[in-house]
A protein has these predicted regions:
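Flexible, acidic/histidine-containing loops and adjacent segments that form or flank the divalent-metal
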Residues: 1, 69-161
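Conserved beta-strand hairpin/beta-sheet module of binuclear metal-dependent hydrolase folds
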Residues: 1-50
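Active-site environment of divalent metal-dependent phosphoester hydrolases
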Residues: 10-12, 31-33, 60-66, 94-97
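Generic detector of contiguous secondary-structure segments
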Residues: 13, 50-55, 146-149
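Structural recognition of the beta-strand scaffold that forms the well-ordered cores
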Residues: 17, 23-27, 53-57, 85-90, ...
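A generic short-segment signal for beta-strand/edge and adjacent turn/coil regions
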Residues: 23, 53-60, 121-131
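Active-site metal-binding motif and surrounding structural segment of the metallo-beta-lactamase
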Residues: 35-89
Length: 161
């Protein structure tokens, strides 16, 4: 197993690459992270016949989701960059939210492409994924993940703590 830390400035983006062809993407950094660092690496993995078993979005701050949005826009329904089996989000999908309660979150870093992230964006991201054939939290029947949840895979398991 190899953990690749993708250059994301103050953001987060990691790819776990197993020798047996399995891969996991954790967070997407900023949109510039995707364009400059993540996309070329995902295309490389795809050229080697690898797939993303899981794309995990830990939370909806700008420095985690902006690159993820760009990735899914590029990948599209036909999964042109790399095949994705399942998306795991830690989000609002199972929580009722009034539009008046939505508070935008943004990062203000010099030289970084800034987009705002909010619960509205989260809801839109999740809906877009589902509408384009990317299952969300399938291992939990679409419900939010909680500490203690475990995904058992062929050769490994993931425990959320």
């Amino acid at each position: 197993m190899r953990v690749r830390i993708i250059k994301a400035r103050s953001g987060d983006c990691f790819v776990i690459d197993f020798e047996n062809g399995h891969c996991i993407l954790i967070d997407g950094g900023y949109s510039n992270t995707y364009k400059a660092e993540l996309k070329p690496y995902l295309e490389y993995l795809n050229s080697k016949g690898k797939v993303l078993d899981y794309v995990i979005l830990t939370h909806y701050d700008e420095d985690h989701i902006a690159g993820m949005i760009k990735f899914f826009e590029d990948n599209g329904e036909k999964q042109r960059v790399i095949p994705v089996k399942e998306v795991i989000v830690n989000g609002f999908s199972s929580v009722a939210c009034d539009d008046n309660d939505v508070k935008p979150v943004s990062a203000h870093k010099r030289g970084i492409d800034i987009q705002k992230a909010s619960s509205k964006q989260e809801y839109s991201f999740e809906n877009w994924c589902m509408d384009n054939g990317y299952p969300i939290n399938r291992f939990k029947s679409g419900k939010s993940i909680i500490a203690g949840d475990i995904i058992d895979c062929e050769d490994y398991s993931i425990k959320f703590a």
